[in-house]
Amino acid sequence: MGEVKSVKVDNWGVFFLQKLQNFFNKTDYCDLTLQFRDNSQLKVHRLVLSACTDYFNVLEQTCEIVDDALIMPNEFQADVVVPIVNFMYTGTLEFELKMYGKLLRTAKEMNMTVLLKLLEAHRRTMENVNRQQRPPSPKGIRRRTVGQPSSGLPQQRVLGPSPQSRNVATPIAQRANTQRGSTGNTMSRTSGGSNRSPYGDSSNVKQEPTSPFEQLRKGYNNNKRPAQTSLLSPPSKKPSLEEVKEFAEQQRMRKQIAAEYGDNDPEYDGGMLYDDVHAGDDDDDDMPPQPSTSKQQSPQGTQTQLEHGSTTIILKQDSPSQTPTIIVKDSSNAKLNHTKIIAEVLRQYPHIVKGHKNIKLKIMPNTPAAPTEKSAPATVKPPANQSSATTSPHKKLHVSFKADKSTPLITAQQKAASSQQKSGTSQTTGNQGTGANPPANTAAAQKRRIDSKTMHALIAQGAENTTGPWLCLRCGVNGRPISIPSYRGFRRHLINTHKETIDPALCEHCGWRSVNNRELHFHMYMEHQTKSLLYTFAECALCNQSYRTKGELEAHINEVHTDDNKQQCIYCNKVFEQELQLYRHMKSYHKEQALEDGIIDETDEEFLGSQDEEEEAEGDEEQEPEQTGKVRILSDISLPATSAITVQQAQQEQLQEEDVEQVQQEVKFVGADGNEVELTDEQRKEILSQLNQQQAGATAGGVVMVLSEPEAEHVKQETDEKSLAGTEEEYDDSQIYSELGAADSVESAKKNIADESKESIDNLEWAENLIAESEEQSNKEPKSDKPRDDISEKLKELTGDWTEDENDDDVDDKPATAELASELANKDPEPTVHEEEDDIDLALQSLHKGPEEATEEKASEESVTSADDAVDAVPNINSQPEKMDVDSEAADEKASKAEVQIKKEAELENDQEEFIKEDSPIPHSDSVAELREAVTASEGEDDVHLEADNIRKELLDELIAEAEKPDQEKDIVQSEENATTEALDRSVTDEDDLVPPTQVSTEQMEIDEPAAEKAAENNEDTRTADEKEAVEDKPNQTQDVTTAEKPTLESAKAGDEATSGEAASVDKVKSLISEWGDDDEDEDENGVSAAAKEEL
């Protein structure tokens, strides 16, 4: 055979691992997928996993595989398994310090001895760091103890962890070297026929120096990844050349390691010191072995034994320098409550907290029964309320349990659950001596953990998942779903976030599915106390239990309340405890039927009045907010001026006293537009007094009175009095009449509103026919009731419709009208004559128009008069009786003066007649334009005004035609005109002061008068208004008087023939005007103005 030469690459293992890592990172050639409980997946190579451990081979045979996805058990979390898999590919273990216990436990379950030794080396490093951080304690001598290996057994030295890289345990060759002290455990492995190693036949066990874990990492130069030291690592020393060579030899030995490891240690004891970085973890760890510098002494020392029920606690401490051991023996066969045991230990021995040392705790049952449970070591924190445990924030007691294969122990997660929930339930699994079956986790957090299969089943249920947990995979991160704590929040999340449509048959609170809508509402009412707005459920009056239907309630009554269902309503089958309750129910809900059947009687109210007093009062208070104020249109209401209120003070006081005796009512005055009218107290009293005096047939003026219901106190008082008296309610006669009047006024208001335009047209037609009929009525006897009623109704309509709002609008229009009047006054006498004739037309038209038009005409006349007259009238009601006495004397004096004046001006009048005849159409057009401007400025109704203009034009044409005739009757009527001049001066001035015609007393307005007297009165009003204008216009005195007299004579022609009724009509006009008039500042004691005297 030829010579065989072997050539190898020293770093082939590193290169091979890097290639595998690249495939792993790119998920190339991966033939197995690990799926965890949080739905995260990890793709791996079966060959790599099988080369490191047999655990996954066993797992594939025992666990479920779905589409090449191996469903991992609940105990193996992704955050623990992923670092271990990365370690298999890279040889670097990257983990957080708080994950140490979980990694150690998982490595034991997987039986990965290399990983266990790596973690053990990291623990020793942390132990050394903690010793350096405590200067008072002596520095320990580190020595590495070597076991007795068999021939060809290489000893391993492990590579430390790096925070970034994925880790792998590196086999270490055995070389002869000086021995260094270290506290560690010997790890050996059997190389089952490893022929590849050149050192396989070595018979000498070489001892090598052991350097700190981080120094080994710095000596690892062949790895491409940068090495980073741990934050807790001590200051590293420079590696010596000898250590570098040793590490190179160890690299060559990696490929010589066999696939099977054996743990020859009879008992694996370990412990770990915690700091505040991971002091709160529930990680498991072993107790550290006793330092080898001090020889193990025989169990001597003090033992303290206490009996606590059936549990015996023994504190064993061989020497003061050694860590004490606590042995707990339980003589009972019940499950051990480890929380209570540790709490009792800390209470009995509080001094063990001060030493800050690990303490061995062995829990042993007294019975020699073979144990069937095994658990990993655990650490325990002392309670936070222990005063001795609060000496330092980071110096906490950690009690480690010594693993005893013959005794059942507690797991860390079980300990955490028991310490939090104070429950002694512990569940552990596993067959002793095997690590294939993992222990079950029973902590509170573990109970919420589910595998991926269950998770997908819950997610598929969607809103029908009534048990929880409620998970949403779409909103999760990296394949991990989010958990929503409640079903209601989960349902809202699906609707609002994912726009899903939920079955309406599902309960929105718990997801319970109902058959129909009524059943769903009943479920929500019973289970979630949500009252239904659609359905009412039958309730048992005896036990207050609700039922979905009346049939179920009846069945319940028949079964449960067989002897109690005597008080049952015969109409609705409702059951009551007492007979009185049944009677009230029948009286409230079945009164008509009960009265017909004779079950109840009206006289029974007398006996129930005293019993129901309090309940009815409470019922009235509850029902009172539902009784809102009733709106009733009472009648035609006018707003009085403050000057005329004092006349009726006595009547108002009397009415006020009567109102106080009656039930008090809150009165609100609302206009036609719906807004409340603000009035003074005197105005409110005046309106109320008018309402009491009005007739049922009076027309409505558009003002609404709102009468709210009486207050609860008055209702309660009346109810109490009437119930005690046992009599029915009785009303005052005044209340009955007022209600009847209000009802009639409502009907009349509706009728008048509907026929408002029709009545306006009727008024105009009546005004036209009145002049033609006046001549016939003067020669005949006055006809009886019907003409009188027509005239009185028309007068009421003309004088009643006058509101404050219209006057406000008229006052606003006065400045513009005054400017127009001043311009007309500065012109030639011709415009003056036109203006006077226009005023005459307006005065005539005021008698023939409807209520709205009359108001607008009066406002236009008042505006012109106010511009010419600089003196304001002062109201004086007390002077009215004197005016009435002097009117006759003033009329005689003015008549004599007027005759002389008329004779002097007769020639001038004749000269002006022809001028007036020729220019008569011009004032007609001017008056029409001026009237239209006044109508536009005020509120006005357009349709009615157009008809009024047409009729007024016809009247003007007739007056102009009659003005051409000789004034034969001028002397006859002159005395009557002079007699009323004084009163008309005051009446026009009162119109400037906005004194409404409604101040005329009701008795005077109701007096029946002949039709002839009414016609004469209207004509005299027109003539006196014209005479007023003639007297006040000084520059054109003569022309004003003559032009005003001619149309006036023609309009009053019919009234002059009725000589028998003239005296009565003059007195009537005086009585009407005396109440309107106010005294001017220039009037004398007889009520005659200075301007009138000067003209006369």
Curated annotation (Swiss-Prot):
Give me the ranges of the annotated region Centrosomal targeting M domain involved in interaction with ZIPIC.
245-468
Ranges of Polar residues compositional bias?
A: 175-213, 220-230
The cross-references to InterPro entries, in alphabetical order and at most eight, read: BTB/POZ_dom, SKP1/BTB/POZ_sf, Znf_C2H2_sf, Znf_C2H2_type
Identify the residues that the record assigns to the BTB domain, covering every copy: 30-97
- Start-end of Acidic residues biased regions: 608-625, 802-812, 1076-1086
- Which intervals hold the zinc fingers (C2H2-type)? 538-561, 567-590
**Stated consequence of mutating L20E:** Reduces microtubule association and protein solubility, possibly by disrupting the dimerization interface
Q: Where is this region: Nuclear localization?
A: 207-271
Top-level division of the source organism's lineage: Eukaryota
Which keywords annotate this record? Chromatin regulator, Chromosome, Cytoplasm, Cytoskeleton, DNA-binding, Metal-binding, Microtubule, Nucleus, Phosphoprotein, Repeat, Transcription, Transcription regulation, Zinc, Zinc-finger
Recorded GO terms, molecular function?
chromatin binding; chromatin insulator sequence binding; DNA binding; DNA-binding transcription factor activity, RNA polymerase II-specific; identical protein binding; microtubule binding; POZ domain binding; protein homodimerization activity
Q: What does this protein do?
A: Plays a central role in chromatin domain organization and boundary function through recruitment by a range of insulator DNA-binding proteins, including ZIPIC, pita, CTCF, su(Hw), cliff and others. Together with pita and CTCF cooperatively binds to and regulates the activity of the Miscadastral pigmentation (MCP) insulator. Cooperatively recruited to the front-ultraabdominal (Fub) boundary by pita, su(Hw) and cliff. Recruitment of Cp190 together with Chro/chromator induces chromatin decondensation.
Q: How does it assemble?
A: Homodimerizes via the N-terminal BTB domain. Component of the gypsy chromatin insulator complex, composed of Cp190, mod(mdg4) and su(Hw). The gypsy chromatin insulator complex interacts with Topors via mod(mdg4) and su(Hw). Interacts with Cp60. Interacts with inv. Interacts with Nup98. Interacts (via BTB domain) with pita (via region between the ZAD domain and the first zinc finger domain); the interaction is direct. Interacts with ZIPIC (via region between the ZAD domain and the first zinc finger domain); the interaction is direct.
What is the name of this protein? Centrosome-associated zinc finger protein Cp190
Q: Which gene encodes it?
A: Cp190
